[in-house]
Design a protein with these regions (language model features):
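Short, solvent-exposed polar/charged micro-motifs at secondary-structure junctions
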Residues: 31-32, 118, 146-147
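Histidine (H) residue identity feature
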Residues: 41, 86, 100-103, 113, ...
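Thiamine diphosphate
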Residues: 1-100, 104, 140
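Conserved thiamine diphosphate
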Residues: 86-140, 152, 164-168
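A short, terminal or domain-edge coil/loop segment
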Residues: 74-81, 99-104, 127-134, 189-199
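Conformationally flexible catalytic loops at phosphate/diphosphate-handling active centers
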Residues: 134-200
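Short, solvent-exposed amphipathic alpha-helical segments in soluble enzyme
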Residues: 9-12, 60-63, 121-126, 151-154
Length: 200
């Protein structure tokens, strides 16, 4: 029940200077947004049920490497491929505990379209603030329902932009050097600094 997200983003993102890329599968989609995030862009992907299962290894990598991204999971009936048109809210524990290892993750659950709108903004803000993947969950009913939505005026919602390093070129860049505000700046791939990203 998530294709409508891709269809709308494919039409609307280019109008706003954004990019939409249709990948060949869920694993490639998750890995593509990790790479795009490392170049300094705000990124998201959307899936449902089994697709969310396929993304788990890459989500774990993004958690470990502290790469901000948003994953939308429009839940459907399961288990396995389940029933694409049947409502379910069965992926909440998977959002929290789905990947191997022990790490924190932020998961938000929406109960109507207004929640989805606001929580999408919140998800991006949280991802950028804490340099972590954020999962936004809602179910098939919300995914297919039509409902009135109040869109705030531009500038009415707080937007957190990525904190970029102020370390000049040719000076050692320490991406995890602590700061008083707790936020960690990032240097964009292809920018002034060369560094490796690993899940180790």
């Amino acid at each position: 029940p998530s294709p409508e997200i891709a269809e709308l983003l494919a039409a609307k993102l280019p109008e706003k200077g954004g990019k939409f890329i249709q990948m060949e599968d869920e694993i490639a989609s998750m890995c593509a947004i990790i790479g795009a995030s490392l170049t300094g862009h705000k990124v998201m992907t959307a899936t449902s049920g089994p697709g969310f299962s396929l993304k788990q290894e890459a989500i774990g990598y993004a958690c470990m490497a502290e790469i901000p991204c948003v994953i939308v999971n429009v839940q459907r009936g399961g288990p396995s491929t389940g029933i694409p048109t049947h409502v379910s809210q069965g992926d909440i524990n998977q959002a929290r505990w789905g990947t191997h290892g022990d790490h924190g993750i932020i998961a938000l659950t929406a109960s109507n379209h207004q929640d989805v709108f606001r929580m999408t903004v919140d998800a991006f803000n949280l991802a950028e603030t804490y340099r972590t993947p954020v999962v936004l969950l809602f179910d098939e009913v919300i995914g297919h329902m039509r409902e009135r939505l109040v869109v705030p005026e531009p500038g009415a919602l707080p937007i957190v932009d990525r904190l970029r390093t102020s370390v000049p070129k040719d000076v050692d860049y320490h991406p995890y050097l602590p700061r008083e505000d707790g936020r960690l700046p990032m240097s964009d791939f292809g920018g002034h600094h060369r560094y490796n990203v690993t899940g180790l």
